[in-house]
């Protein structure tokens, strides 16, 4: 039996669930419906700070997701469509300045991606095209 989708007593998980680290701090919280992750989910670091948050639809990452560093600063934002990166993604330097940004389609970088130094100055642009034969 898969403990990720089944409750301790056997049936598929249904409802709000939380899991804890060995030390008792919250590791994650979210909802299952018929054994599949659904709705908003939050994942935490051992220091208690939020690590990531986003949504699941029918067990797959969907919609906007956000990740954070151990100190709580924003690390990355992006979108998923059925567990695949799709839409604008941004990563941030530890000082909070934008590191890079661009777009994904079906898990592939497409179009212009821009990279910035820690002071915010544009240092590189690169064009990406979908690989032949891909779903992009």
Predicted regions and their residues:
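Glycine/tyrosine- and acidic-biased, solvent-exposed loop/turn segments at the edges of beta-strands
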Residues: 1-136
């Amino acid at each position: 039996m898969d403990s990720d989708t089944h409750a301790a007593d056997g049936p598929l998980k249904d409802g709000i669930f939380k899991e804890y680290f060995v030390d008792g701090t919250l590791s994650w919280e979210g909802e299952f419906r018929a054994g599949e992750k659904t709705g908003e989910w939050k994942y935490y670091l051992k220091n208690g700070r939020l690590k990531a948050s986003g949504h699941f639809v029918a067990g797959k990452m969907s919609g906007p997701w956000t990740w954070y560093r151990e100190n709580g600063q924003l690390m990355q934002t992006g979108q998923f469509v059925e567990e695949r990166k799709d839409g604008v993604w941004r990563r941030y330097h530890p000082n909070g300045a934008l590191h890079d940004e661009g777009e994904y389609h079906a898990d592939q970088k497409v179009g212009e991606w821009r990279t910035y130094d820690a002071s915010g100055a544009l240092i590189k642009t690169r064009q990406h095209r979908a690989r032949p034969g891909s779903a992009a």
